[in-house]
Amino acid sequence: MVLDSLGKALSNALKKIARAGSVDEALVKEVVRDIQRALIQADVNVRLVLKLTKEIQRRALEEKPPAGISKKEHIIKIVYEELTKFLGTEAKPIEIKEKPTILLMVGVQGSGKTTTVAKLARHFQKRGYKVGVVCSDTWRPGAYHQLKQLLDPYHIEVFGDPNEKDAIKLAKEGVEHFKAKGVDLIIVDTAGRHKEEKDLIEEMRMISNEIKPHEVILVIDGTIGQQAYNQALAFKEATPIGSIIVTKLDSSAKGGGALSAVAATGAPIKFIGTGEKIDDLEPFDPARFVSRLLGLGDIQGLLEKFKELEKEVEFTEEDLERFLKGKFTLKDMYAQLEAMRKMGPLKQILRMIPGLGYSLPDEVISVGEERLRKFKVIMDSMTEEELMNPDIINYSRIKRIARGSGTSVKDVKELLNQYNQMKKFFKSMNKRQLLRLARRFGM
């Protein structure tokens, strides 16, 4: 989970209010101290923390809750509102207004820029845009091959020449190449060789003058914490069309420091990197981000994930008719497991459900994820005939499947038991209920 330790600490602070018999000044000050401690441990600038928590304390002690809202609920709302304001208030998505829209990506060495270029290309492809990627990184020979490796499976073309040493020439030729192909979006990757902002900004200006991008995006490594302030500020002052993506928020305790430092400059954060996979990039919406961070859920984010699934996995009405008649196969179950896998880590999904927040222990979640992985491996060891007609799977087949998948007979039996329960469940529903369920879960 992105900023897991910070989220747990903030969520625990709010629980003190929720569980208290009554709320007095001493409790408010105690909770404010907990919030201060959590933010400082996440490498948020101390001056910013004190300013934020002073306002939370003032409002919590002075404001009267509106009619119908308890004092506890009002204080939780105040914490939510002030943290949201702290991180930028509103979402500012990248807009594809012109065809083609050109995005220029820059970032210092090790920021995760090239991987982020691939993630961004995939993000827009999933939303129906035709995307082309230009690799103008002439400094690192592996950059072109890295982009090809990441994007070839999704049939996203990468333009580049590992032997060319002129970055500006490559960028210009790449943009012209994709303009001729009529793509909707061109993403230009640049060299990440600079360790200092001023060198980076100089190269950005030179390439910008040649390709005239609609937006320049700085990729910042979330593990650098509050040091991100200097990078973001220099960048914001250098270009009026700049925005920021903060990466590696899944792997650092300093991510909160990086996010708050960037937000303090006023530079808009457009996306955050939430993992290593190509789909682990999400639009940054401060309100939804804070809601998840505090354990309050993110229903809108969950619904968007389901909507994405509708394009990936689609069961026809004929399929649903089959399910109602009890003709639900292991192949259908496999498609569902694959759909769940595409939604992202189970922990990430559960954090979006209001009320669950951080209440489920990590070990429980990891057992659930391991079980799903195991089921998929077991089904990969089955024949097409077994997947389509599970009734033929007798004990000798179970032993063969267990051997082939490196699992136990007990594991295979557990999968078959789960399958039979799902089959029974579908058979017990009427068509209207099943259609509603199908729409909800991307079937």
Curated annotation (Swiss-Prot):
It catalyses: GTP + H2O = GDP + phosphate + H(+). Transmembrane segments: none annotated. SMART domains: AAA, SRP54, SRP54_N. It holds the Pfam family SRP54. Coiled coil: none annotated. One of its GO terms (biological process) is SRP-dependent cotranslational protein targeting to membrane. Its EC number is 3.6.5.4. GO terms for molecular function: 7S RNA binding; ATP hydrolysis activity; GTP binding; GTPase activity. It comes from the Archaea. InterPro entries: AAA+_ATPase, P-loop_NTPase, Signal_recog_part_SRP54_M_sf, Signal_recog_particl_SRP54_hlx, Signal_recog_particle_SRP54_M, SRP/SRP_N, SRP54, SRP54_GTPase_dom. GO terms for cellular component: signal recognition particle. It is found in: Cytoplasm. Keywords: Cytoplasm, GTP-binding, Hydrolase, Nucleotide-binding, Ribonucleoprotein, RNA-binding, Signal recognition particle. Composed of three domains: the N-terminal N domain, which is responsible for interactions with the ribosome, the central G domain, which binds GTP, and the C-terminal M domain, which binds the RNA and the signal sequence of the RNC. Involved in targeting and insertion of nascent membrane proteins into the cytoplasmic membrane. Binds to the hydrophobic signal sequence of the ribosome-nascent chain (RNC) as it emerges from the ribosomes. The SRP-RNC complex is then targeted to the cytoplasmic membrane where it interacts with the SRP receptor FtsY. This is Signal recognition particle 54 kDa protein. It comes from Pyrococcus abyssi (strain GE5 / Orsay). The lineage of its organism: Archaea, Methanobacteriati, Methanobacteriota, Thermococci, Thermococcales.
